[in-house]
Amino acid sequence: MDLSSLSPAKGSVKNKKRVGRGQGSGNGTTAGKGNKGQQSRSGYKRPVSEGGQMPLYRRLPKFGFTKPNRKSVIGVNLSQIAKWIEDGRVSSEVGVEDFKQLCNASKSDYFKVLGNGELGTAVKITAHFVSKSAEEKIKQAGGEVILAERTLLEAERVRDLSTDEALLKPKAKLRKFKKQSKSS
């Protein structure tokens, strides 16, 4: 047996269908496209034409909406944080900016630390949310948990404070003003 004598199993490889190469090929003239008209031409075809039938997009009602200020929460496990520390991507302090960069997230995302995995070293973690099991494991390892009050985007918009300080400062509660009735 030589390399030159090798061939694929019989019937496993099909010949390519060469369309539009004469009547004798069985795929000549219209090249498998049927008769004349828009469907036989190259380029654009109407994607949702249903003839005279009421189209699907008009048969179904409108529903739902996308909340413009929705919270997007990204979960990060302790095992991921431990791996980042081993790889030298983060030091003993892991902040919201580190999460944003390493999770490929946006500035408006919230981060939650989850308890899957173990931490071998003491780590200071700043995140928006922390699960109970994660908090216990971090404290057992000698670490510290700090809860951030704002997203990075919100913190950047605070003029008086640096981004790090603004992350930790609670948002001011809005005061509701009551309309005073006119006394006559």
UniProtKB/Swiss-Prot annotation:
InterPro entries: Ribosomal_uL15, Ribosomal_uL15/eL18, Ribosomal_uL15/eL18_sf, Ribosomal_uL15_bac-type, Ribosomal_uL15_CS. Disulfide bonds: none annotated. GO terms for molecular function: rRNA binding; structural constituent of ribosome. One of its GO terms (biological process) is translation. Pfam families: Ribosomal_L27A. One of its GO terms (cellular component) is cytosolic large ribosomal subunit. PROSITE patterns: RIBOSOMAL_L15 (PS00475). The keyword Isomerase does not apply. Residues 21-35 have a biased composition (Gly residues). The keyword rRNA-binding applies. Keywords: Ribonucleoprotein, Ribosomal protein, RNA-binding, rRNA-binding. Residues 1-55 are annotated as: Disordered. It comes from the Bacteria. Signal peptide: none annotated. Belongs to the universal ribosomal protein uL15 family. Binds to the 23S rRNA. Part of the 50S ribosomal subunit. This is Large ribosomal subunit protein uL15. It comes from Prosthecochloris aestuarii (strain DSM 271 / SK 413).
